[in-house]
């Protein structure tokens, strides 16, 4: 094994900085009643305004809040939206996560599927961690420099495999809400 590692240029990571360490925590997110959350990573101060324009023009009836955390300069949480309660909930969520260059959107009267593609196509957006109404935990790493999101726990673990009856129920539901003919 050692020879393989040596031949393939794998080297053990030895950190000369004794202070370097990483703590992991799971932050439980309190999603407002009747809302979906979209949580993602972004990189530029105009994110909040661009995401506002995307949602407002894609789903005009949507109620939403948006917040974005800067990762340099004043490191402020920037917020936009058309519902003050959802804006405040986004700010509270990002304060509890504490990571830079993250955005949070709470969406009501619309589903994430309505806005995800335009959000992913926004030049500032680097990635989407989740789009869900399920119970949510955010896995956060903290170092001396700051915090970052490693991933999310979206909902619960699988309990089984879909049966024919489950499949029929799923298909009926999608037609009932207008997503299939």
Regions found by a protein language model. Give the residues of each.
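Charged/polar low-complexity intrinsically disordered segments
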Residues: 4-7
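N-terminal, charge-rich interaction modules
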Residues: 20-79, 164-181
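Structural motif
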Residues: 35-38, 62-67, 76, 101-104, ...
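Positively charged, polar, low-complexity stretches
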Residues: 71-95
